Regions:
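Active-site/ligand-binding loops adjacent to catalytic centers
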Residues: 237-263, 314-431
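A short, small-residue-rich loop immediately preceding and capping a beta-strand
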Residues: 176-201, 205-214, 291-301, 327, ...
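Active-site/ligand-binding-proximal alpha/beta "capping" segment
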Residues: 249-318, 419-422
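Short glycine/serine/threonine-rich phosphate/pyrophosphate-binding segments
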Residues: 160-166, 187-205, 218-222, 272, ...
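Catalytic phosphate/nucleotide-handling subdomain of diverse soluble enzymes
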Residues: 440-467
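Positively charged, low-complexity intrinsically disordered leader regions
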Residues: 91-179
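N-terminal juxtadomain amphipathic helix
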Residues: 23, 29-111
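Active-site-proximal loop->helix
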Residues: 182-185, 194-240, 244-253, 339-343
Length: 467
């Protein structure tokens, strides 16, 4: 086993600048509101939403690590990312602080993973992150292109990572006796991959799941959800009511006592943690042998981009990477609320802003959400239907990551989405869907604009399998 890499001071400063939050002195992890700075008490069993939410602030909770007390494990013999990187999870620090042994926590994760395998055919393993030289010619670049392939993950996408991290936390607080009464149902609003992932993981945990879907949800997705035992509610749009109707129904269910089992950080900030394993895996693959200059991430609700950015930032702070790559995001021409918000925040900054100026603009934006983020005004349509969220719920963290790293929000049209999907499938042999390859459309745009150097390394994530 290789020794863990110790943190470097400059990398720790990078994380402090990028996320501007403090950690709890009791645990090596804490849950902090990115909007108002409220630190959630460690005794709270469901640290999902800020208690001060309800005003115009963007009260999305973030899990924050005290990297001075942690190390990044580089052992390659452990295939399960939730075991390998357990020391970076809030649920682990909560469990061990209350007397659960390391082995007991590992056994819990392995037992839950075995249940996932029972339901879906296989459990969680580190997914491939490799160079894809066959992409260079179609993109007309000499840069090194890397692909993180999530199409073979549980339920066919990255979404199950978010859900499994939540399930582990829920089982920890149950075993520790931090809750009483009946186990509340779980709830999610989704049109596809997120719902399927939630249903698989909920079934593995033997928990009731409420799923709110749009009227155009695919029949084969609904059939699979029913097989998995999910309780489905179809949600039509209501005349004169802005926003996603499935999200409105989700909020109503949460108000009635359901627990948010979602990828949206605004409803459950702890959902981001499981997705951070993507960033850890990418960093571990590059440790000691490579660098990453750009990462291009497709965005719907924003949980994927938020998780990858934070996972890479923590990896840099722990000395695995020499620094953060530029974080770029991709949305469709059908709906681009994140790009709109980015431009509004950037409009408050000078041409070459320093970290403190970025932090000030982000603090203002987080306190005045309605000035920067609101539902898309028209009903969006795209081949990449999985990223057509009316709002980017985790927008503040993602805008901050782009501003701090020099990344850009990209908007791609339907032709670019279709072409990128064709290129991605042909060049890599990966059966990725148009949503899952939308990041490649953004990378192609950056290459055409001459923004990817010939000696640079850029990564995309193929996040959803063709069904």
């Amino acid at each position: 086993m290789e020794p863990p890499i110790e943190p470097r001071q400059d990398a720790k400063e990078l994380t402090a600048h990028a996320f501007s939050l403090s950690s709890s002195p009791e645990l090596a992890s804490s849950i902090v509101c990115g909007g108002c700075g409220t630190v959630i008490d460690a005794s709270e069993p469901y640290p999902f939403r800020c208690p001060r939410s309800g005003d115009d602030g963007d009260h999305v909770l973030r899990r924050v690590l005290d990297v001075s007390r942690l190390a990044f494990p580089l052992e390659v013999s452990e295939p399960n990312p939730f075991v390998r990187w357990r020391g970076l999870f809030h649920s682990y620090h909560l469990a061990t602080a209350h007397g659960m042994s390391d082995q007991a926590y590992v056994d819990l994760v392995r037992d839950l993973d075995s249940e996932v395998a029972r339901v879906d055919g296989h459990g969680f393993v580190v997914t491939p992150f490799t160079a894809a030289p066959a992409l260079a010619d179609p993109l007309e670049t000499r840069a090194s292109i890397w692909v993180k392939d999530e199409t073979g993950n549980v339920a066919g996408s990255h979404k199950a990572r978010h859900m499994f991290g939540l399930l582990v936390h829920l089982e920890v607080v149950r075993l520790l006796g931090m809750t009483d009464g009946p186990i509340p149902p779980l709830a999610i609003a989704s049109c596809g991959n997120a719902a399927l992932a939630a249903a698989v993981v909920a079934a593995a945990g033997r928990r009731r799941l409420l799923v709110f879907v749009p009227t155009d949800a695919e029949a084969k997705v609904l059939d699979r959800l029913r097989v998995l035992g999910a309780e489905i509610t179809v949600c039509p749009r209501e005349a004169g009511v802005a926003g996603d109707p499935t999200y409105h129904r989700l909020q109503a269910a949460i108000a009635d006592g359901a627990l948010p089992f979602t990828c949206q950080g605004n409803e459950n900030g702890l959902a981001i943690e499981g997705g951070e394993t993507l960033g850890y895996e990418m960093a571990a693959a590059l440790a000691g042998q490579g660098r990453l200059d750009h990462v291009v991430i497709q965005v719907g609700g924003g949980a994927l981009a938020s998780a990858v950015a934070q996972g890479l930032s923590e990896s840099a702070a722990l000395g695995v990477l020499p620094g953060m790559p530029r974080v770029h995001t991709v949305q469709t021409a059908g709906a681009w609320p994140l790009a709109r918000a980015f431009e509004l925040v950037a409009g408050r900054l000078p041409a070459k802003p320093g970290p403190e100026e970025v932090h000030a603009a982000i603090r203002y934006a987080a306190a005045h959400r309605s000035e920067f983020m609101w539902p898309w005004e028209t009903v969006p349509h795209s081949l990449a239907h999985g990223i057509l969220d009316d709002e980017t719920y985790d927008w503040v963290a993602v805008v901050e990551a782009m501003l701090m790293t020099g990344g850009q929000p990209l908007v791609v049209n339907e032709g670019e989405i279709a072409q990128a999907n064709g290129i991605g499938v042909e060049a890599t042999g990966i059966e990725v869907d148009p949503t899952g390859s939308a990041g490649l459309a953004g990378l192609a745009q950056l290459c055409r604009r001459g923004l990817i150097g010939p000696d640079e390394h850029a990564a995309v994530l193929f996040t959803g399998a063709r069904r």
